[in-house]
Amino acid sequence: YTFWPTFWPATLAGISYKEAWYDVDKMVDATREAMHLLDPDSFSPLIFSFGPVMEALGYKAMYWPGKGVGDNVTFQYLDDEYVSADEYDDYLFDPTGFYLKSYLPKIATAFEGFANMPRLPSLSEWRFFASLSAFADPKLQESMKQLMESGEKMAEILSAGGKFIGE
């Protein structure tokens, strides 16, 4: 069977779900302990310590341990309308543009500046060059900074997971 480590290793190791969600080293240790106990055929290499990333993103589509729910409560998706019925035509016309400019700004503050992103696909490089002025928008620049911070935090988590896989 394939072991998919989420919160059970935290319980086994005696750490809170919040600790598991925010401290990748503790979660790696907990996952290692669970792997030795269960001896699965395979396992998911992803270590679920996304708290710092979700904080940096300003993620709004879920609660997680220590943020919206208790320290020993699993994450909970928030039932909200992220795509309204009158937006389906926009989505069908330009799925990528809709995702970047409409959907993502609704689920994370780091993407709010993307609402003002230009439409980059063009057959003319002149239109593309002119559209680059949108990147001077302070909101879009702030979004880029938040995303860089989020990316750095995710790289740390993936690095810790990669070291664990290499053991």
Segments predicted by a language model, with ranges:
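Catalytic cores of TIM-barrel enzymes
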Residues: 1-167
